[in-house]
From Swiss-Prot:
Subunit structure: Interacts with MCHR1. Interacts with SEMA4C. Interacts with DIAPH1 (via FH3 domain). Interacts with GRM5.
Protein's UniProt keywords contain Cytoplasm: yes
Tissues in which the UniProt entry reports expression: Abundantly expressed in whole adult brain and in all individual brain regions examined, including spinal cord. Weakly expressed in ovary, testis, fetal brain and small intestine.
Modification Phosphoserine, positions: 2, 448
Effect of residue 392 to E: In a colorectal cancer sample; somatic mutation
Family of this protein: Belongs to the neurochondrin family.
Outcome of mutating residue 652 to L: In NEDIES; in the neuroblastoma cell line SH-SY5Y, in which NCDN has been knocked out, does not rescue impaired neurite formation following retinoic acid treatment, contrary to wild-type; in these cells, there is markedly decreased phosphorylation of ERK1/ERK2, compared to wild-type, suggesting impaired GRM5 activation
CC per GO annotation: cytosol; dendrite; endosome membrane; glutamatergic synapse; membrane; neuronal cell body; perikaryon; postsynapse
Gene source species: Homo sapiens (Human)
Protein name as it appears in the record: Neurochondrin
Membrane topology: Lipid-anchor
Regions that span the bilayer: none
């Protein structure tokens, strides 16, 4: 059979591509095409390659393009099977005068015909061809060769059909298809547009796996698309706006793409546009803000103007969408605008290296205040039937980001919304799995049609904690929160989150958000201890909280890198112990003794004596572990010292326990070994408070202090109260 005959046989694949499953079947049981049936019989009975080729030619003549329905394709497959196409794809020897790619083209055409059937597209015999099919996309050859072009089209037909099966994307990724598609697109050869379309589909279906298998190639495509975006002057720039979010990596966008992406967006957003042109640009900017913060925006005047433009546009969109009741909300666009507003909040509150100048910050705070007012207006209209919708979650998130930094403005509106926020947080807390699913839906809604990199927190309560921390200081909002049951909810939440730090969990991979959430809860409880002590005494949830603090602190203070959390737990527990001192749990039980021993450890290890060159006397200095975080720690430490001092007269067993720990003796020894001039007055006051109460509470403590030169040390540091106490019998 000649090479021309082989090429003609390849027309079977052409017919298959043009065929449609929806067209009426040609071969119903009572009216099959007799000629086609005869040729299919010949195909089934063929004894060698030549007879099979001849039969294929006859079949293509009997079946006109577009006439092959699903049943006919299946009967052709039953007649041909996979063996013959397999041989065509792998043959090394072609007939004289026939290019070897013509045989492969016929093999691919047959596969393309078969892949029109979804069952066959998922067949192992098709799946194991993925690696060889992928190589055809990047094979060198004459770009004008019709047979080669036909083979490339058929290859894309096969791969696209496989991608449409349930497990197809996974097989394509494992078979090297993503890299091949990237190279085919970057080569801009025949069919490169089909490569891009298939890449988009695979990224949408399995983004993480795609990046894991082909990150360098995908980054090369991103660089190419970014350059095209920056240069585009026609409508293609709007198409690229929709494509680019799909090609941003789940971790960090390469810095070399920043300039092109920002320049392209600045050109689009700085023009007068319709909403269909502007919205994809806002969504791309939101994805970049979510992945990179403000790193992709250049410093200087142009960058600050661009950032201000982004935030202003976002605020306008939010107000237009949410202020008018009954208006259909483009939730994906508004959620993207929320991400840009959050970027604006971060930059407005940044003290160092902010992109914004002070007048710009003032202007943006004003427009964001108006947009947040629209968000509050929207949330006040939300009924219980909508509480589980992703857009509501996104709206609560941006409100939480605002309240974390600003609670003085919109106070009336915020107080009006607080009951809803408490109920909403409680609903999602009680249905944690649905809340986690909501976070993913919000991320998908906000950033792109595919799964984004960093996911947003999965519980509404964590989003609201910083704002509630500020609000519990104020009388009005605090009363509303207490009335709505927020303290009880916070206690339950704290206990649930604390379980993640228990020995049964791998705390080395504990998300930072969990620890930050626990610390913020502690700050809220500290506010309540100071401003609403009666609540602590009467609400049973705080008794449970106290028990958890007591049992947890001993292990926590021993863990590396968790000193700040330990400080929060110790200080909160000491302050609560003063209010709950009559509780049976605090009457010298093993748990209470363990807690106070751990609290003493935290308080006693903060400072050390440090030698100074050229001086005989050491100075009081922070211990290495405390030094790096003392700015965040010192307020808790001083508050903890004060709270411990207050506990001593309330708990008779505490002074003997402190004596057994040798803290008072070691404290006096430390003060005696350093220069008094190196000890700040506030430190002297804190140390004297503890020593005086211990001395007053227990005779053995007084004797131990005298033996440690306590009176002399008190005199050196002008601790009059301690000196007087130690001079008494």
């Amino acid at each position: 059979m000649s090479c021309c005959d082989l090429a003609a046989a390849g027309q079977l694949g052409k017919a298959s591509i043009m065929a449609s499953d929806c067209e009426p079947a040609l071969n119903q049981a009572e009216g099959r095409n007799p000629t086609l049936e005869r040729y299919l019989g010949a195909l089934r009975e063929a004894k060698n390659d030549s007879e099979q080729f001849a039969a294929l030619l006859l079949v293509t003549k009997a079946v006109k393009a577009g006439d092959i329905d699903a049943k006919t394709r299946r009967r052709i497959f039953d007649a041909v099977g996979f063996t013959f196409p397999n041989r065509l794809l792998t043959t090394k020897e072609a007939p004289d005068g026939c290019p070897d790619h013509v045989l492969r083209a016929l093999g691919v055409a047959l596969l393309a015909c078969f892949c029109s059937d979804p069952e066959l597209a998922a067949h192992p015999q098709v799946l194991n061809k993925i690696p060889i099919l992928s190589t055809f996309l990047t094979a060198r050859g004459d770009p004008d060769d019709a047979a080669r072009r036909s083979m490339i089209d058929d290859t894309y037909q096969c791969l696209t059909a496989v991608a449409g099966t349930p497990r197809g994307p996974r097989h394509l990724i494992a078979g090297g298809t993503v890299s091949a598609l990237c190279q085919a697109y970057l080569g801009h050869g025949y069919g490169f547009d089909q490569a891009l379309a298939l890449l988009v589909g695979l990224l949408a279906a399995a983004e993480t796996q795609c990046w894991k298998e082909a990150e360098p190639d995908l980054l090369a495509v991103l660089r190419g698309l970014s350059e095209d975006f920056q240069k585009a002057e026609d409508a293609s720039k709007f198409e690229l706006c929709q494509l680019l979010p799909l090609f941003l990596p789940p971790t960090t966008v390469p810095p070399e793409c920043y300039r092109d992406l920002q320049a392209g967006l600045a050109r689009i957003l700085g023009s007068k546009l319709s909403s269909w042109q502007r919205n994809p640009a806002l969504k791309l900017a939101a994805r970049l803000a979510h992945a990179c913060g403000s790193d992709w925006i250049p410093a200087g005047s142009s960058g600050s103007k661009f950032l201000a433009l982004l935030v202003n546009l976002a605020c306008v969109e939010v107000r237009l969408a949410l202020e008018e009741t009954g208006t259909e909300v483009k939730e994906d666009v508004v959620t993207a605008c929320y991400a840009l507003m959050e970027l604006g909040i971060q930059e407005c509150t940044r003290c160092e290296q902010s992109l914004l100048k002070e007048p710009q910050k003032v202007q943006l705070v004003s427009v964001m205040k108006e947009a947040i007012g629209a968000v509050i207006h929207y949330l006040l209209q939300v009924g219980s039937e909508k509480q589980k919708e992703p857009f509501v979650f996104a709206s609560v998130r941006i409100l939480g980001a605002w309240l974390a930094e600003e609670t003085s403005s919109l106070r009336k509106e915020v107080c009006q919304l607080l009951p809803f926020l408490v109920r909403y947080a409680k609903t999602l807390y009680e249905e944690a799995e649905e809340a986690n699913d909501l976070s993913q839906q919000v991320a998908n809604l906000a950033i792109s049609p595919t799964t984004p990199g960093p996911t947003w927190p999965g519980d509404a309560l964590r989003l609201l904690l910083p704002g509630w921390c500020h609000l519990t200081v104020e009388d009005g909002p605090r009363e509303i929160l207490i009335k709505e049951g927020a303290p009880s909810l916070l206690c339950k939440y704290f206990l649930q989150q604390w379980e993640l730090t228990s020995p049964g969990h791998d705390t080395s991979v504990l998300p930072d958000s969990v620890e930050i959430g626990l610390q913020t809860c502690c700050h809220i409880f500290l506010n309540l201890v100071v401003t609403a002590p009666g609540l602590i005494k009467r609400d049973a949830c705080f008794t449970s909280l106290m028990n958890t603090l007591m049992t947890s602190l001993p292990a926590l203070v021993q863990q590396q890198g968790r000193l700040l959390l330990a400080a929060n737990v110790a200080t909160l527990g000491l302050l609560m112990a003063r209010l709950l001192s009559t509780s049976p749990a605090l009457q010298g039980t093993p748990a209470s003794r363990g807690f106070f021993a751990a609290a003493i450890l935290f308080l006693s290890q903060s400072h050390v004596a440090r030698a100074t060159p050229g001086s005989d006397q050491a100075v009081l200095a922070l211990s290495p572990e405390y030094e790096g975080i003392w700015a965040d720690l010192q307020e808790l430490w001083f508050l903890g010292m004060q709270a411990f001092t207050g506990c001593v007269p309330l708990l008779p067993w505490l002074a003997p326990a402190a004596l057994r720990s040798r803290w008072p003796q070691e404290l006096l020894q430390l003060l005696g070994s350093v220069s008094p001039n190196s000890v700040k007055p506030e430190m002297v006051a804190a140390y004297q408070g503890v020593l005086v109460e211990l001395a007053r509470a227990n005779r053995l403590c007084r004797e131990a202090m005298r033996l440690q030169a306590g009176e002399e040390t008190a005199s050196h540091y002008r601790m009059a109260a301690l000196e007087q106490c130690l001079s008494e019998p």
